[in-house]
Amino acid sequence: MLYPSIDNLLLKIDSKYSLVTVAAKRARYMQLENDKGVLPSYQSDKFVGKALEEIHAGKLVLKNDEK
C-alpha cells in the first residue's frame, strides 16, 4: 500500500492533474535547492514521495488564483 493514498490526497487537492502538478513542482524545487523539507521525518526517500507527504500533512497547498 502506498502512503499517502491517492484518495486521501484528493481530499486535500480536488484534481488529479493539480495534485500531480503541485507535487512535481515541489519535488523539483526540493531537488534543485537541496531543500530538506518541512516535515520532521519522511517515509519516502524520493522527492515526489516527500512532496506528497507534505500535501497529505497540509503543509503544501494549492493556491487558486482565479479572478
UniProtKB/Swiss-Prot annotation:
HAMAP family: RNApol_bact_RpoZ (MF_00366). It comes from Listeria welshimeri serovar 6b (strain ATCC 35897 / DSM 20650 / CCUG 15529 / CIP 8149 / NCTC 11857 / SLCC 5334 / V8). Pfam families: RNA_pol_Rpb6 (PF01192). One of its GO terms (cellular component) is DNA-directed RNA polymerase complex. GO terms for biological process: DNA-templated transcription. NCBIfam families: rpoZ (TIGR00690). Promotes RNA polymerase assembly. Latches the N- and C-terminal regions of the beta' subunit thereby facilitating its interaction with the beta and alpha subunits. GO terms for molecular function: DNA binding; DNA-directed RNA polymerase activity. Its EC number is 2.7.7.6. InterPro entries: DNA-dir_RNA_pol_omega, Pol_omega/Rpo6/RPB6, RPB6/omega-like_sf. This is DNA-directed RNA polymerase subunit omega. SMART domains: RNA_pol_Rpb6. It catalyses: RNA(n) + a ribonucleoside 5'-triphosphate = RNA(n+1) + diphosphate. Disulfide bonds: none annotated. Keywords: DNA-directed RNA polymerase, Nucleotidyltransferase, Transcription, Transferase. The RNAP catalytic core consists of 2 alpha, 1 beta, 1 beta' and 1 omega subunit. When a sigma factor is associated with the core the holoenzyme is formed, which can initiate transcription. It comes from the Bacteria. It is an enzyme of class 2 (transferase).
